[in-house]
């Protein structure tokens, strides 16, 4: 499909309710996520002068060149990265258990992972990692479940239990026992995926945030190849769980990481965001096309057009400027073209190499502003 339009609707069309800048950013983010353009439903329907909307229309006109660049370089290639395993059959799965709200309850739970600078994907085909939820499993065929478990999966205990109940324990490698609903603190082990953050702690304050399914669990290894990334201790330092987060490589060659303590929340500390990026690289076997290696709050959409070019749309999702934003790109190219929202171009060189990734430190990105980064010598086409 060549044209996938999104609608930017500023209902109830009162100018002070939404900034012109954010309206322009919203359209660009939709294009980054896969749309080929945007239709703007932003003007008043009343029989009155439209003078108050002139600044809004002017901003959209100023941003048109950036939209054109995005359409040209992103083309119709699909975003590659972390797939949240949503499908349209989940609503029916919720109805089947007489709990219709359950089917969509996970939507948005993966947002904190994606906000740390990991690329989003919206289809299983071509995705590098699957973020798996019980709602997803309930609406997947056995073949789809096995295919996911033969790739890279990050998940929680609720999903682990469901997978095991369905007979996939040989592929998950572990079980969950002894839930601890209070006074747990996550402590990182000296595992290589934790890098320099061994013994760092993450306290999610269970007494404040009583989130269903987020109690601290003891993960039991059903295969000795399971490796421990974190344990749980209480406020006195006493161990409550010798294993609360673990990784496993199964007989299909798939890799799985299970977190038994706030797997989708409270992920934005330096140590935890760094750990999650290392975990996602491991799960993907370094097939992530790009990610933000520095400590910034950034949303990322990455495409690989057929020409071999990598095109990246990124959003600084913070009210602070992103200085020193370090973008890791799976490429052998030594230069990247960076376009701001005024369509001004800068060419930057890779600062260093990290395995299959070249690292590019971008010029400062203003708060809640986007960039288009293009790496590779071939012209994109669509």
Language model regions located:
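C-terminal beta-strand-rich structural cap/linker in extracellular carbohydrate-active enzymes
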Residues: 152-155, 353-382
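Short acidic low-complexity segments
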Residues: 118-128
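A glycine-rich, often tryptophan-bearing local segment used as a flexible ligand/cofactor-contacting loop or short
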Residues: 136-208
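Solvent-exposed beta-strand/loop surfaces of large extracellular or lumenal domains
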Residues: 236, 337-358
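Short, well-ordered beta-strand segments enriched in hydrophobic/aromatic residues
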Residues: 309-317
């Amino acid at each position: 499909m060549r044209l996938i339009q999104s609608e930017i609707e500023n209902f109830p069309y009162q100018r002070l309710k939404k900034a012109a800048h954010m309206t322009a950013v919203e359209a660009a983010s939709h294009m980054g996520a896969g749309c080929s353009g945007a239709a703007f439903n932003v003007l008043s329907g009343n029989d009155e002068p439209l003078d108050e909307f002139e600044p809004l229309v002017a901003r959209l006109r100023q941003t048109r060149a950036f939209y054109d660049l995005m359409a040209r370089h992103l083309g119709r290639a699909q975003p590659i990265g972390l797939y949240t395993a949503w499908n349209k059959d989940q609503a029916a799965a919720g109805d089947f258990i007489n709990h219709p709200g359950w089917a969509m309850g996970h939507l948005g739970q993966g947002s904190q992972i994606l906000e740390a600078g990991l690329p989003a994907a919206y289809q299983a085909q071509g995705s590098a990692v699957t973020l798996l939820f019980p709602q997803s499993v309930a609406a997947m065929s056995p073949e789809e479940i096995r295919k996911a478990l033969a790739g890279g999966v990050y998940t929680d205990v609720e999903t682990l239990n469901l997978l095991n109940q369905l007979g996939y324990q040989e592929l998950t490698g572990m079980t969950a026992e002894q839930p601890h609903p209070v006074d747990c603190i996550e402590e990182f082990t000296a595992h290589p995926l934790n890098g320099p953050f061994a013994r760092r702690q993450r306290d999610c304050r269970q007494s404040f945030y009583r989130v269903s399914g987020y109690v601290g669990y003891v993960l039991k290894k059903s295969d000795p190849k399971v490796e421990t990334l974190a344990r749980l201790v209480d406020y006195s330092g006493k161990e409550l769980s010798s294993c609360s987060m673990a990784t496993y490589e199964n007989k299909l060659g798939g890799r799985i990481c299970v977190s038994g303590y706030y797997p989708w929340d409270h992920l934005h500390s330096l140590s935890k965001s760094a750990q999650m990026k290392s975990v996602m690289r491991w799960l993907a076997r370094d097939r992530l096309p790009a990610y933000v290696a520095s400590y910034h709050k950034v949303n990322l959409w990455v495409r690989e057009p057929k020409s071999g070019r990598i095109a990246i749309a990124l959003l600084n999702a913070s009210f602070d400027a992103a200085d020193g934003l370090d973008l890791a790109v799976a490429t052998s190219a030594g230069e990247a073209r960076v376009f701001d929202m005024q369509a001004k171009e800068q060419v930057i060189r890779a600062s260093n190499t990290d395995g299959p990734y070249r690292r590019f430190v971008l010029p400062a990105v203003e708060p809640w502003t986007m960039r288009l980064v293009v790496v590779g010598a071939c012209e994109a086409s669509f």
